[in-house]
Amino acid sequence: MALKYYKPTTNGRRHMSSLDFGANLTTNKPEKSLLTILKKHSGRNSQGKITVRHQGGRHKRKYRLIDFKRNKDDITGIVKTIEYDPNRSANIALISYIDGEKRYILAPKNLKVGQKISSGPKSDILVGNALPLAKIPEGTFVHNIELKPGAGAKLIRSAGTWAQIQGRDENGKYVILKLKSGEYRRILATCRATIGVVGNEENSLVNIGKAGRNRHKGIRPTVRGSVMNPNDHPHGGGEGKQPIGRKSPLTPWGKKALGVKTRNPKKPSTKLIIRSRKETKK
């Protein structure tokens, strides 16, 4: 999808860019049967406490039900439309199956309207088809990857992301994947993945241009802890500009902020990571 640039008619327009939706999208009307209401929570939980900061005030939107499991085996589907989804960075494709059912999937790069797709172990290695990792040859780029068989995809769902199959272990139980971040990890060979790279890869190149566009998306400002009140942040308080008053910078919850690993070392999936993204960049 191409980028669209604007003339500097105002300070907000200067350097602003956006995606040219007319170049790739085929409709602006979503499938009504696959829409649900998406309530606004502004980052609050059921007690009204903020659990996710910097959220609130976004435009009204409806949620598109996406098929992350891709479990409709041995039934051919045809790509009817490529659509915009306000809930994610990737575009989505409406698939109409020969039995009459319709489903949304993530739209991979180079997926075309009218193209046939399928799911299951017997599917061909073509863009948009979903297969168990055990059936996909080495060197193939995949996305929409499951972590547990049948649980639905959890990895590689954002625009422009991919993973490449590097090999298999001795027993054939695990498949080794290289992620775009540089991480190498094992995933069960019975987990499913979709062939291809997630489309809309220019999404990361968009220049927001002005604060109002982020507010429209529901992203509120992020400010320094030193300009907050002491009840909001350990760095807050004082008359005017003040040092943080601590030996080292802290998070809003009082934990050390610099050089501290945040991943739980007892997390079960740690043993499946062969090489972390940080080790790859060294």
From Swiss-Prot:
Quote the Gene3D superfamilies the UniProt record gives. 2.30.30.30, Nucleic acid-binding proteins, Ribosomal protein L2, domain 3
Quote the cellular component terms of the Gene Ontology held in the record. Answer: large ribosomal subunit
- Keywords recorded for this protein, A-Z: Ribonucleoprotein, Ribosomal protein, RNA-binding, rRNA-binding
Residues spanning the signal sequence: none
Q: Which InterPro entries match?
A: NA-bd_OB-fold, Rib_uL2_dom2, Ribosomal_uL2, Ribosomal_uL2_bac/org-type, Ribosomal_uL2_C, Ribosomal_uL2_CS, Ribosomal_uL2_dom3, Ribosomal_uL2_RNA-bd_dom
SUPFAM superfamilies, from UniProt? Answer: Nucleic acid-binding proteins, Translation proteins SH3-like domain
Instruction: Name the Pfam families for this protein.
Output: Ribosomal_L2 (PF00181), Ribosomal_L2_C (PF03947)
Q: Which GO terms describe its biological process?
A: cytoplasmic translation
* Quaternary structure note: Part of the 50S ribosomal subunit. Forms a bridge to the 30S subunit in the 70S ribosome.
What this protein is called in its record is Large ribosomal subunit protein uL2
What lineage does the source organism belong to? Bacteria, Bacillati, Mycoplasmatota, Mycoplasmoidales, Metamycoplasmataceae
What gene codes for this chain? rplB
